[in-house]
UniProtKB/Swiss-Prot annotation:
SUPFAM superfamilies: Bet v1-like. One of its GO terms (molecular function) is signaling receptor activity. The gene is PR1. It is found in: Cytoplasm. Keywords: Cytoplasm, Pathogenesis-related protein, Plant defense. This is Pathogenesis-related protein 1. The lineage of its organism: Eukaryota, Viridiplantae, Streptophyta, Embryophyta, Tracheophyta. Belongs to the BetVI family. InterPro entries: Bet_v_I/MLP, Bet_v_I_allergen, Plant_def-hormone_signal, START-like_dom_sf. It comes from Asparagus officinalis. Its main location: cytoplasm. One of its GO terms (biological process) is defense response.
Length: 158
């Protein structure tokens, strides 16, 4: 078993608060609307969006080796636009990973947009290749899809 971590940054032209709300807090609702070829649906399994909430995202892409992801919110800071989540089911848990957590922070930038900083930590099961490059690409696609939606809908998530 191998432990690993990576960090990634994505610059977007949308304010940190709007990106945080859309890409993190409401992604289970927004994702299926803006990337239906990738996300079939989403829901809150338990909780109210605060720490301890469990959300499920159903994947609609045959290139992804799992059909859903369930994640638990471990930390949410609405003032600093931060969230930490842990994979609790699906998403390769037990097949690719022993465990995985992801920390997102949306930092305001001087141009009115923000810098999305992501740090992932995980334990890969024996014989499984580290696919962090694909994960980073997925994060970039997630943020850029959210950015495009918010730029096209300036009153959304205000």
């Amino acid at each position: 078993m191998s432990s690993g971590s990576w960090s990634h940054e994505v610059a977007v032209n949308v304010a940190a608060g709007r990106m945080f709300k859309a890409a993190m807090l409401d992604w289970h609702n927004l994702g299926p609307k803006i990337v239906p070829d990738f996300i079939a649906g989403g829901s809150v399994v338990s909780g109210d969006g605060s720490v301890g909430t469990i959300r499920e995202i159903k994947i609609n892409n045959p290139a992804i080796p799992f059909s859903y992801v369930k994640e638990r919110l471990d930390f949410v800071d609405h003032d600093k636009f931060e969230v930490k989540q842990t994979l609790v089911e699906g998403g390769g848990l037990g097949k690719m990973f022993e465990c995985a957590t992801t920390h997102f922070k949306f930092e305001p930038s001087s141009n009115g947009g923000c810098l999305v900083k992501v740090t992932a930590s995980y334990k890969i099961l024996p014989g499984v290749a580290d696919e962090s490059a694909k994960a980073k690409e997925g994060i970039t696609n997630h943020m850029k899809a959210t950015e495009a939606y918010l730029l096209a809908n300036p009153t959304a998530y205000v």
